Design a protein with these regions (language model features):
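Mg2+-dependent endonuclease catalytic cores in nucleic-acid-processing enzymes, primarily RNase H-like
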Residues: 1-118, 137-141, 147, 155-158
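Short, hydrophobic alpha-helical segments
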Residues: 130-138
């Protein structure tokens, strides 16, 4: 599909790029999205909402364990990376070859002393959030473009 990743840009610029991909698309955000922006003093989530971005009502968490309530799943990176790996191995996650930036991040992704090195992994993190939030995914229902049959349609009707 598509990806977007630009550093050091303003909220209005990011908002415009996000909305251009579909205003209805829900945006998943990390817990630190509630932190105040250094420039304005307002939290980033509220700034994006004000710009018309469809922000999810709550911050990202991994799926909860069976029987526990939503929001208790934590935000373990390891769980998300392993889910991505399993999905790739079972052909349930495919990355298009036009996703150069993501493919580069995947090539550079590595561990040191058994721990994931969090460096230049913005798109990997976004993909991890997406995969771990699939439980909340919904299809967009489109309204029919024309509600009248051809025989009922009257170009001169008011």
């Amino acid at each position: 599909y598509d990806s977007y990743s630009i550093r050091q840009e303003t909220v209005p610029v990011h908002s415009s790029a996000i909305k251009a991909r579909g205003k209805w698309i829900p945006v998943i955000w990390p817990q630190d999205g509630r932190q105040a922006d250094k420039g304005s003093g307002k939290n980033l989530t509220e700034q994006y909402k004000k710009e018309g971005v469809n922000m999810c009502p709550e911050w990202f968490t991994n799926p909860p364990q069976k029987g526990l309530r939503e929001g208790t799943g934590g935000n373990s990176v390891e769980a998300g990376i392993m889910e991505m790996l399993v999905r790739m191995q079972t052909k349930r996650l495919k990355v298009f070859k036009n996703q150069n930036k993501l493919l580069e991040e995947l090539r550079m992704h590595h561990r040191k002393d058994g721990k994931i090195v969090p460096m230049n992994d913005d798109l990997i993190s976004a993909l991890r959030y997406c995969i771990m939030s699939l439980r909340k995914a919904r299809l967009k229902i489109y309204e029919p473009l024309q509600q009248l049959t051809d025989s009922e349609f009257n170009v001169f009707a008011r």
